[in-house]
Regions:
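N-terminal pre-catalytic "stem/leader" segment of glycosyltransferase-like enzymes
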Residues: 1-87, 267, 271, 311, ...
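Conserved catalytic-core segment of nucleotide-activated headgroup transferases in glycan assembly
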Residues: 20-30, 150-204, 210-216
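Membrane-proximal helix-turn-helix segments that form the acceptor-binding/catalytic region
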Residues: 104-121
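Donor nucleotide-sugar binding/catalytic pocket of nucleotide-sugar-dependent glycosyltransferases
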Residues: 120-132, 138-154
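Short alpha-helical segment that forms part of, or immediately flanks, the ligand-binding pocket
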Residues: 220, 242-248, 261
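Acidic donor-binding loop of glycosyltransferase active sites
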Residues: 224-237, 250
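Conserved acidic donor-binding segment of nucleotide-sugar-dependent glycosyltransferases
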Residues: 266-276, 284-289
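A charged, aromatic-enriched C-terminal amphipathic alpha-helix characteristic of glycosyltransferases
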Residues: 287-325
Length: 328
């Protein structure tokens, strides 16, 4: 069976319903994955209503992305009980770093853990997350590669670029923006940053050009112009920034533990907090043109051969769904 032969429902905190189409301007990784799977999206808080509408065992697979917030709302109904009635097989999709639930109340932490133990399978962002969840719940866990549909959407890799550095986030611990800013200064180039949801007051007073909020397609086209990326983000999840840079062949300095960084920018990956080595790499990229060209070439080639593009992602994910379906 092909992926779109299965009936797949995907539940998130998003307030929309339906299937993803290619004209969606925000075709980031999670949206792209829904498109490739042919999944029908529903708001997670409407699981009881979806069950009432379709009845038992309507979907072959039900994927749930448990939201970072509003856990107390999920605790008000039998989410897993209803989900297991509605779907023949249930799957959890990681959202954010694997430790995030440990910032919740004790009651919410126990609810979260119990929910994970009831899924038939879990998807995780990085290999370290796979190991974490396998140890936590003793369930089948697979890596869900961070998918981009750049080729299908007609986005072109960069052919020319300006002398500017782009950092991957704002000035909060979640993104590690201050550390990225300090390393970016080594290039003696203008520094640019996206505007994220956690942007703080007075951040605009820094000598950083902040980009306006953009759709994903706009972001990818804009990104193509930059010389180098720096993203010392201590919060490891999907790793989209390092991946986006690699598509364009933009060298990116970042941390160990993020698969997209380690796999696509192996010469520029440092241990958490190793600002000294990060600055050394920055100076080497600035002063050694041969090193820069090698890092650029490697990132682009490794992306082409990775699971992060449609060509390689589809057979990988198809095997996983076929295996879970056969176990039914």
């Amino acid at each position: 069976m092909g992926l779109k032969d299965y009936k797949i429902a995907w539940f998130t905190e998003g307030g929309w319903q339906g299937k993803v189409t290619l004209d969606n301007p925000n075709m980031r990784n999670d949206v792209s994955t829904k498109y490739i799977l042919g999944a029908e999206h529903y708001p997670i808080f409407q699981i009881p209503q979806v069950l009432q509408h379709f009845g038992d065992n309507y979907f072959d697979f039900g994927i749930v992305t448990l939201p970072k917030t509003n856990t107390e709302q999920l605790m008000k109904f039998d989410m897993m009980g209803d989900l297991k009635k509605l779907c023949k097989r249930t799957i959890s999709m990681q959202e954010g770093p694997h430790w995030l639930f440990q910032d919740y109340t004790m009651e919410q932490q126990i609810w979260w853990y119990n929910a994970l133990t009831e899924f038939d399978m879990l998807f995780a962002h990085n290999l370290k997350d796979v190991s974490y969840y396998k140890g936590l719940v003793n369930k089948p866990v697979h890596k869900m590669p961070t998918l981009m549909l750049t080729e299908r959407l007609g986005i072109q890799p960069r052919s020319e670029w300006s002398d500017a550095v782009i950092i991957g986030g704002n000035m909060v611990r979640w993104y590690g923006g201050f550390d990225s800013y300090m390393v970016a200064q080594e290039f003696d180039m203008p520094i640019v940053a996206p505007s994220m949801g956690r942007k703080i007051d007075r951040e605009d007073e820094m000598d950083i050009q902040h980009l306006p909020y953009m759709s994903w397609v706009e972001w990818m086209n804009n990104l193509s112009q930059y010389h180098v990326g720096v993203h010392l983000m201590p919060t490891h999840a999907a790793g989209t920034f390092a991946l986006n840079c690699a598509f364009h062949g933009i060298p990116c300095i970042g941390y160990v533990g993020l698969d997209t960084q380690e796999e696509l920018h192996p010469h520029l990956t440092v241990y958490d907090g190793d600002m000294e080595q990060a600055k050394k790499y920055a100076r080497e990229l600035k002063e050694d043109e041969e090193f820069y060209e090698e890092c650029s070439k490697v990132s682009r080639e490794y992306y082409i051969n990775s699971l992060y593009n449609e060509k390689n992602f589809v057979p990988y994910i198809t095997r996983i769904f076929e295996g879970l379906h056969e176990d039914n």
